[in-house]
């Protein structure tokens, strides 16, 4: 089942309640405004967010604070199969796509770095008490690194950059995500 939203409050609700998730589901968030997707261990700079009228919502994923910009593709994959490989397959397919487009991308743990230094794609995975695996994928299409520095509370070790700077579009990345998900019965 695939759910889409552009509203961060709806995204948080969907993730918290695992709406419609019986065995497996995909949530695609295409933010309509800048927002922060935080974790319990890595909050956003709430004072700065409030001063700018920006929202921050805690999701149940691992990893750090993600700043989502309009045009970005944020993916949540829920599964009761603890051995699912959605992140791994999606990462490999993204690497192949970027290389096909002539983009020099390297894998650095859970991140893909363009030009060996700019984070354009990141993943995290967490398991809930209910035996549900939540895999999160952040695909940066648009990015303002200075704004990310002001919103995130941890020191930035990898500078983010948007794939639009390399000529890659939201639609191309959405097509890739949906293709991998639709083919997932055969590869996961």
What is each stretch, according to the model?
Residues 74, 113, 138-140:
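Active-site scaffold segments
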Residues 93-106, 123-188:
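Long, positively charged amphipathic alpha-helical accessory segments at protein N-termini or as interdomain linkers
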Residues 111-114, 121:
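Glycine- and Gly-Pro-enriched alpha-helical subdomains that act as flexible
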Residues 44-45, 119-122:
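Short, charged/polar, Gly/Pro-enriched secondary-structure boundary elements
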Residues 10, 82-90, 169-173:
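Short amphipathic alpha-helical segments
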Residues 69-110:
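Contiguous, small/hydrophobic- and glycine-enriched helical/loop subdomains that border
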């Amino acid at each position: 089942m695939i759910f889409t939203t552009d509203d961060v409050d709806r995204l948080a609700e969907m993730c918290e309640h695992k709406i419609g998730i019986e065995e497996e589901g995909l949530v695609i968030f295409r933010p309509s405004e800048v927002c922060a997707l935080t974790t319990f261990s890595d909050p956003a700079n709430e004072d700065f967010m409030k001063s700018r009228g920006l929202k921050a919502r805690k999701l149940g994923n691992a990893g750090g604070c993600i700043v989502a910009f309009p045009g970005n593709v944020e993916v949540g994959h829920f599964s009761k199969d603890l051995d699912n490989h959605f992140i791994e397959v999606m990462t490999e397919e993204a690497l192949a796509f970027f290389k096909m487009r002539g983009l020099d991308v390297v894998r650095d743990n859970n991140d893909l770095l363009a030009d060996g230094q700019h984070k354009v794609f990141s993943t995290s995975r967490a398991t809930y008490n209910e035996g549900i695996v939540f895999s999160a994928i952040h695909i940066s299409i648009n990015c303002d690194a200075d704004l990310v520095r002001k919103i995130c509370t941890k020191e930035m070790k990898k500078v983010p950059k948007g794939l639009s700077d390399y000529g890659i579009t939201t639609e191309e990345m959405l097509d890739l995500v949906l293709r991998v998900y639709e083919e997932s019965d055969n590869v996961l």
